[in-house]
């Protein structure tokens, strides 16, 4: 069995449901410290939701101008398993069947972490004095609130003036085969909770009440039909979607006094959070609604245009697999949104994502070593460029 698979299984066997780390970071620090990494814990959060964070950095070969830094970012936490009896094998017992490795976190994203650790081990064995600095940013709070994880580490790094140049996030980005898709950006996410106030009353006497659902519907229809922007070469147009509508007392003869609507923007770089907020408020005001609206900005959009990192990863994928990879900004958010604040080039690359968060999550074993090799080839290419500069 390959060293990558062995490490992946060791990580999968640790039941690290958010915010638990279950010893994953201790295991990983034990692999990184002998390679010359300085491992620093940056745990955060209240005792009731304590998050484990690791920042591990290895300096470049000494002398000269400040070295550029490549960071691998990942999360050791996983989502809940769902009913264990529905799994074909225990979710935290790594199992091999039909050429696949099964277990919670196999694809999201413990195999990616294992692959990058082994890639770094192989790279440093061949290049013990690299021209670039290497770092790992790992957290146990990506699948949850994402408040005390990567966000906190990035803030601490920024406060002490540490600079990052390239970042690879090990999210499962591939579709059918490892390397067929990478993410070079993500849309922003902006959520709103709208409460429209009316007057509660008997359903037989509407003249004595004011139905907030009826009042809200025209405004909601207009919001749903609005073209917020047209997207661009890298992003689809900004979308607005309702996720929940709550109104009524449960009785069938009462006009409700309020209706609550939860909605979300996934917005591209053609729009801003403040601009979207202003447009929504103007629309609601125009409809004459009596309302309250609270906003939650989950993350700004980010984009890494084709450059050093994208080119290095694309070439590594082609050299290893023969695939011409597709650049994409689709899908949900990731911790890349926090890292992009302090790192100009961020991409995401990992195994196929067809089974993430599902019963019987797995990776195809034949995809594992190519992923490790792609990471190693990327390291080699970026290091060669830095050495030649």
Swiss-Prot record:
Matches recorded under Pfam families: M20_dimer, Peptidase_M20
EC annotation from Swiss-Prot or TrEMBL: 3.5.1.18
Matches recorded under Gene3D superfamilies: Zn peptidases
InterPro entries: Bact_exopeptidase_dim_dom, DapE_proteobac, Peptidase_M20, Peptidase_M20_dimer, Peptidase_M20A
Active site, UniProt feature: 77, 142
Catalytic activity reported: N-succinyl-(2S,6S)-2,6-diaminopimelate + H2O = (2S,6S)-2,6-diaminopimelate + succinate
SUPFAM superfamilies: Bacterial exopeptidase dimerisation domain, Zn-dependent exopeptidases
Keywords from the UniProt entry: Amino-acid biosynthesis, Cobalt, Diaminopimelate biosynthesis, Hydrolase, Lysine biosynthesis, Metal-binding, Zinc
GO BP field: diaminopimelate biosynthetic process; L-arginine biosynthetic process; lysine biosynthetic process via diaminopimelate
An MF annotation (GO) of this entry: succinyl-diaminopimelate desuccinylase activity
Residues engaged in binding Zn(2+) 2: 108, 143, 357
Needed cofactors: Zn(2+); Co(2+)
Pathway this chain belongs to: Amino-acid biosynthesis; L-lysine biosynthesis via DAP pathway; LL-2,6-diaminopimelate from (S)-tetrahydrodipicolinate (succinylase route): step 3/3
Co-factor remark: Binds 2 Zn(2+) or Co(2+) ions per subunit.
Annotated family: Belongs to the peptidase M20A family. DapE subfamily.
Assembly with partners or alone: Homodimer.
UniProt name for this protein: Succinyl-diaminopimelate desuccinylase
Source organism of the structure: Paracidovorax citrulli (strain AAC00-1)
Gene name, Swiss-Prot/TrEMBL: dapE
